[in-house]
A protein has these predicted regions:
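Extracellular structured ligand-interaction cores
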Residues: 52, 105-109, 142, 350-351, ...
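Classical eukaryotic N-terminal signal peptides for Sec-dependent ER targeting/secretion
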Residues: 1-17
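Serine-hydrolase-like catalytic core of hydrolytic proteins
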Residues: 97-289, 293, 298, 342-369
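Substrate-gating cap/lid region and adjacent catalytic-acid/histidine neighborhood
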Residues: 295-513, 597
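Short Gly/aromatic-enriched secondary-structure transition segments
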Residues: 47-57, 62-74, 367-386, 542-546
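Non-catalytic accessory segments of hydrolases
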Residues: 2-3, 19-200, 221, 362, ...
Length: 599
């Protein structure tokens, strides 16, 4: 396979050599806003590719532009050196217990990686000859836009973590995006002063930039795939219900995150309450939204990000204090109704979708619980108080009936633990993992897939990633000692070289490299054609079938390079259990997600 790939590189080089505009080994690209001077990088298999880093896709959101929608980028004269990553958006990563606040408010930049650029105006702009248009479009590469995870409060599109080393062994253009995070990106007063969803609007602005400029990098603006993990995966899903995103992308991949998950949407009233809590802590008037926003625009970004400690009750729970929110209707609004209503009333964009989970998603939380002995004791002792808040059903379904809350909580305890105490033994640990996995990730994905096949004509491809590699993200989520299985985010290691930064002392095994071959092959093919397995190969020796039946959804199970199989009814008994809980909560809670009976 590698010999064939090397031959492909040689052929591609011969095709593209006449299209490059290279100065002293560095590529030049002309965009609508100005000329870029890029750099070169090498892929895992030794391919030389072109990188343009720190490209502005919006004006810096500073001063009066803080808490405002992104504005068009400012054009520049001369040549902009796009050879280094821009600053990351200001943040503090509570998931790894980061102490310092890092980054900058001037952060709306993206990176573009390409195997071949079309550098001149003549090469980038199609003429009016239909045959030449067809040939040039065919020669362009599919585009993949990456939205990072991190709970909409941490992360970045930087090359050190989400670089092209693995994916650019295939013929595609990769775009990675920074967007505003935490209260700077997701605070909302639930009115027109600060309606919210700024981070999602940043993403949409980046998508517009790609649509207008990606041809200059050899990309096909009519073959764009959004993909993301965790909050990035949920972001992709949100763009699928936004009519302003229509036409800017053509396929979506949501890894370990979609808007059915309970941490992805703020209940009415709560977003405003948190905005007021933040403002009051910083000495701002909370009499009205206008005064609050004007006051917060005068505060430092560090002060605003530093309020994250105000909202923590059990570790970093409740999960993600500043999230997407339903906005009042106005021009440019990103979300004006519960996205579940959008899906069930036919307003989800009908594009191919790929989604799935890792086998132990809940390790993202449970490693932090078991990494500190007092947390395990607290969970056992105060289960009735912690679980409704931490699993988010108290907020999501606005449970005001104490008897109902206690009944649901007791049902959860009995299902996962029976009469056993929650302690340090392995059985207990993995049951806590299952509980968080199902509540935060698995059940929402199960519901999303079922609704998709009922309401859409495009295919949905469902997967279960159960490959245990050389190292796990659980080691940085709070416990470097114990085993938690295949953690949330573990799949990232086989699409991007994140491990080189996060786990520098771990060398990828031969099996890890085979998993990179598998994952990049599947992701590339989906981006290229909408079919993740167009043919049976040695790398993936079967066809991945889309989901056809809601009563027993088909899915691809990835365990190792020799065990990739089709199966159905993923975690079925656990999903039936959560179906019953959700039904009870929606029937008896005061939920804003209390949808029509027929839904």
């Amino acid at each position: 396979m590698r010999e064939c790939r090397n031959n492909m590189f040689i052929q591609l080089g011969l095709i593209c050599i006449f299209a490059f505009n290279v100065v002293c080994g560095n590529p030049i690209a002309k965009t609508l806003n100005g000329t870029l001077y890029g750099t070169t990088m090498s892929t895992r298999l030794g391919r030389s590719i072109y990188a343009f880093l720190g490209i502005p896709y919006a004006a810096p959101p500073l001063q009066k532009l803080r808490f405002k929608p992104p504005q068009s980028p400012i054009a520049w004269n001369g040549t902009l050196h796009a050879t280094a990553n821009a600053e990351i958006c200001m943040q503090r990563n509570i998931y790894v217990d980061q102490k310092e606040i890092v980054g900058s408010e001037d952060c709306l930049y993206l990176n573009v990686y390409t195997p071949c650029i079309q550098c001149t105006e003549e090469q980038s702009n199609l003429n009016h000859d239909p045959e030449q248009q067809r040939q040039k479009a065919f020669a362009r590469f599919p585009v993949m836009i990456w939205f990072h995870g991190g709970g909409w409060l941490a992360g970045a599109g930087h090359s050190e973590y989400y670089g092209p080393k693995f994916l650019l062994d295939f013929d595609l253009v990769l775009v990675t995006v920074n967007f505003r995070l935490g209260p700077l990106g997701f605070m909302s007063t639930e009115d027109l002063e600060c309606p919210g969803n700024l981070g999602l609007k940043d993403q949409q602005q980046a998508m517009r930039w790609v649509h207008e400029n990606i041809a200059y990098f050899g990309g096909d603006s009519n073959r764009v795939t959004l993909f993301g993990e965790s909050a990035g995966g949920a972001s992709v899903h949100y763009h699928m219900v936004n009519p302003l995103s229509a036409g800017l992308f053509h396929r979506g991949i949501s890894q370990s995150g979609n808007f059915y998950n309970p941490w992805t949407l703020t209940s009415p009233g709560i977003a405003r309450m948190r905005a007021m809590t933040l403002g009051k802590h910083l000495g701002c008037s909370t009499e009205n939204s206008k005064d609050l926003i004007e006051c917060l625009q005068m505060k430092s970004a560090e002060e605003i990000i530093g309020t994250d400690q105000l909202f923590k009750k059990f570790g970093y729970c409740p999960m993600i204090p500043f999230r997407p929110v339903i906005e009042p209707e106005h021009p440019g609004a990103f979300l004006i109704e519960d996205p579940l209503i959008s899906v069930r009333e036919g307003r989800l964009l009908d594009v191919p979708w790929m989604t799935g989970v890792t086998s132990e998603e809940g390790a993202i939380k449970v490693a932090g619980i078991y990494g500190r002995e007092q947390n395990v004791k607290e969970l056992e002792t105060n289960f009735d108080k912690i679980v409704p808040m931490s699993l988010l059903y108290d907020e999501r379904y606005n449970v005001t009936n104490e008897d109902l809350r206690n009944e649901i909580t007791a049902t959860i305890r009995n299902f996962y633990f029976g009469y056993n105490v929650i302690d340090y033994n392995e059985y207990s640990r993995f049951k806590v993992v299952d509980m968080y996995s199902d509540s935060w990730f698995n059940h929402g994905t199960h519901e999303a897939v079922q609704d998709f096949i009922v309401n859409q004509t495009s295919p949905v491809f469902y997967y279960y990633f159960a490959y245990k590699g050389s190292i796990s993200f659980s080691t940085i989520f709070g416990d470097p000692v114990r085993d938690y299985g295949v953690s949330h985010a573990d799949d990232l290691q086989y699409l991007f070289p994140v491990g080189e930064q996060l786990f520098p002392n771990t060398t990828l095994s031969e099996e890890d490299h085979k998993m990179i071959d598998i994952m990049t092959y599947i992701w590339y093919n989906f981006a290229n054609s909408g079919n993740p397995t167009p043919k049976v190969t040695k790398v993936v020796p079967l066809k991945w079938k889309p989901v056809k039946t809601s009563s027993a959804p088909e899915y691809l199970r990835i365990e190792n390079s020799k065990k990739i199989t089709m199966d159905h009814s993923l975690l079925w008994q656990r999903m039936i259990f959560w179906d019953s809980l959700t039904h009870r909560l929606m029937n008896h809670g005061n939920t804003f997600r209390h949808l029509k009976d027929e839904l």
